[in-house]
């Protein structure tokens, strides 16, 4: 995930949603 942001640490559901 993390298509919007390069952070797949825990914001993979944050920036998108």
UniProtKB/Swiss-Prot annotation:
Its main location: secreted. Belongs to the pyrokinin family. The modification Leucine amide is found at residue 17. This is Pyrokinin-5. One of its GO terms (molecular function) is neuropeptide hormone activity. The keyword Calcium does not apply. It comes from Rhyparobia maderae (Madeira cockroach). It is found in: Secreted. One of its GO terms (cellular component) is extracellular region.
């Amino acid at each position: 995930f993390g298509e919007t942001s390069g952070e797949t640490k825990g914001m993979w559901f944050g920036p998108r949603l």
